[in-house]
């Protein structure tokens, strides 16, 4: 009778060990899933930022296509009045 009880407890112990191992595997899978979800969240934020920029891009394209003039750089000169303008990279509309 005592031997049967010991065998029963050993089987119970083996099952508990399997349950512990399964629980550890589950914890690792959940942690991996959490990391993947974090990556997905970061990617979603990047996509949202890009999508939020499109109206500005379209507006810039529209403004550029409506503008008939061209922008050119002012050539450098030796006079002091033009030197400060060219150092700052000013442009002149033609």
Curated annotation (Swiss-Prot):
Primary residence: nucleus
UniProt-listed InterPro entries: DASH_Dad2
Highest taxon of the lineage: Eukaryota
Biased composition, class Polar residues, residue ranges: 76-87
Consequence of gene loss (knockout): Condensed chromosomes with long mitotic spindles and without sister-chromatid separation. Sensitive to cold, thiabendazole and osmotic stress.
Coiled-coil residue spans: 18-38
Cellular compartments annotated: Nucleus; Cytoplasm, Cytoskeleton, Spindle; Chromosome, Centromere, Kinetochore; Cytoplasm, Cytoskeleton
Disordered: region residues: 72-94
GO cellular component: condensed chromosome, centromeric region; cytosol; DASH complex; kinetochore; microtubule; mitotic spindle midzone; mitotic spindle pole body; nucleus
GO biological process, one term: mitotic sister chromatid biorientation
Protein keywords: Cell cycle, Cell division, Centromere, Chromosome, Chromosome partition, Coiled coil, Cytoplasm, Cytoskeleton, Kinetochore, Microtubule, Mitosis, Nucleus
Subunit: Component of the DASH complex consisting of ask1, dad1, dad2, dad3, dad4, dam1, duo1, dad5, spc19 and spc34, with a stoichiometry of one copy of each subunit per complex. Multiple DASH complexes oligomerize to form a ring that encircles spindle microtubules and organizes the rod-like NDC80 complexes of the outer kinetochore. DASH complex oligomerization strengthens microtubule attachments. On cytoplasmic microtubules, DASH complexes appear to form patches instead of rings.
Family: Belongs to the DASH complex DAD2 family.
Function recorded in the entry: Component of the DASH complex that connects microtubules with kinetochores and couples microtubule depolymerisation to chromosome movement; it is involved in retrieving kinetochores to the spindle poles before their re-orientation on the spindle in early mitosis and allows microtubule depolymerization to pull chromosomes apart and resist detachment during anaphase.
Protein name (database record): DASH complex subunit dad2
